[in-house]
Amino acid sequence: MTETHAFVEISSRSAAELAEKYLTLWNEPDADRRRRMIAELWREDGRHILQPPQEMRAIAAQPGIALTAILEARGYEEIGARATSAYEHWVGSEGLSFRGRDDLDRLGDVVKFHWEAVAKDGEVFAVGLNFLVLAADGRIERDYTFVVA
């Protein structure tokens, strides 16, 4: 009897290509190209869930502060707005770029990798960890992003 699995099997090479395309999105200056990349990478009902740095979470946890410590974008429009905002602030204004670290891994339908936000002089400004949960069609269903340093 053959057992059917609900998750997509992807090769290490295609996992690396997915992570590379994902990071390229956050560095992309053209808004139309970002929109097309989002449609290629995410399902239409996909989610991008971001845990911001500890400093932001501490502020959000204070009494009387109407912020959430977890930021979530659902669907192409919200993910596009998130990508545009990130590009305008971190890449456009701050001059940073996003690059992957050499630690990509996959397990079933999950791809895991670290990334860095790097200044033009090579200084690492921030480090993040992503878990991409893939749908059966290979596109991102849920994207969990942790800013770890």
Where does each model-flagged region fall?
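C-terminal and inter-domain tail/linker signature
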Residues: 1-149
